């Protein structure tokens, strides 16, 4: 019992990793962290297949954030039993929320929405994805926890799906002996756009590490597995995150 109390005290008392850029996502799952007033964020990523991702965000007085990104997280197919093709989509989002301890003991809370505004050389006709989510995040020192719910809707060709609720979860572990390093894990969802049968939601599990290389930037290396893929279908990716403060 004494050992359990000692570990619990260490978790609650340990200081968070210093100078950590304010990340709006763990790996794929969103967080409730918002950048400080006047800050701008950017992420550049590439995976082992050569697919790239670009993200940019701008703070609105520290209470909200505008986002724009281009990635290939969504898959599309005309015969999903044979091949699922990454779809490069441009998406824009808006997030608004409250910071941690706005009321004593309260986690950070964010309401976010995101919608497709462009599709680049899509393998299927008229792909679109829209989602709205609520996420709570809490910094406990060596551990940061994230939990929420996502309402996703998608359409492809003449098929449209109604919004469906799915859980979101994430964890960041900051070992005190490695103050610049973090272990990351999350659960998120993206649609598979089947041009024949319509959209289907698929879970994505991610695990990775983040290294705080600079006070303004961090490097991530991660592996993501997607529902329906075998081990060879897992994605290995590297990302660089940066934040500019006013």
Question: Which functions belong to the PLM regions below?
Answer:
Residues 39-41, 62-68, 101-109, 142-147, ...:
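Repeated loop/turn-to-beta-strand initiation elements of outer-membrane beta-barrel proteins
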Residues 92-94, 211-212, 230-246:
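Outer-membrane beta-barrel "beta-signal"
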Residues 68-165, 169:
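Outer-membrane pore/translocation modules
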Residues 29-31, 41-45, 79-85, 119-125, ...:
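Outer-membrane beta-barrel domain signature
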Residues 46-50, 60-62, 68-76, 98-100, ...:
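Transmembrane beta-strands of outer-membrane beta-barrel pores
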Residues 4-18:
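Hydrophobic h-region of N-terminal signal peptides that target proteins for export
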Residues 41, 53-55, 91-95, 133-135, ...:
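Membrane-embedded beta-strand positions in outer-membrane beta-barrel channels/transporters
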Residues 15-43, 172, 176, 181, ...:
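Outer-membrane beta-barrel biogenesis signature
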């Amino acid at each position: 019992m004494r050992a359990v109390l000692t570990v619990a005290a260490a978790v609650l008392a340990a200081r968070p990793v210093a100078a950590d850029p304010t990340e709006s996502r763990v790996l794929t799952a969103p967080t409730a962290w918002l950048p400080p007033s006047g800050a701008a964020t950017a992420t550049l990523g590439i995976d082992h297949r050569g697919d790239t991702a670009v993200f940019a965000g701008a703070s609105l007085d520290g209470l909200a954030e505008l986002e724009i990104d281009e990635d290939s997280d969504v898959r599309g197919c005309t015969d999903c039993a044979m091949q699922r093709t990454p779809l490069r989509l441009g998406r824009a989002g808006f997030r608004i929320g409250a910071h941690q301890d706005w009321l004593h003991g309260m986690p950070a809370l964010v309401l976010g929405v995101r919608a497709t505004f462009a599709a680049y050389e899509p393998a299927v006709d008229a792909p679109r994805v829209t989602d709205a989510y609520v996420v709570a995040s809490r910094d406990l020192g060596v551990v940061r926890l994230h939990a929420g719910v996502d309402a996703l809707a998608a359409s492809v060709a003449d098929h449209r799906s109604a919004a469906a609720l799915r859980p979101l979860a994430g964890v960041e572990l900051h070992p005190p002996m490695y103050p610049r390093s973090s272990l990351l894990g999350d659960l998120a969802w993206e649609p598979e756009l089947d041009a024949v049968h319509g959209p289907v939601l698929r879970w994505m599990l991610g695990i990775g590490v983040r290294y705080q290389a600079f006070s303004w930037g961090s490097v991530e290396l991660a592996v993501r597995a997607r529902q329906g893929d075998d081990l060879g279908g897992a994605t290995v990716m590297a990302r660089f995150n940066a934040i500019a403060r006013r």
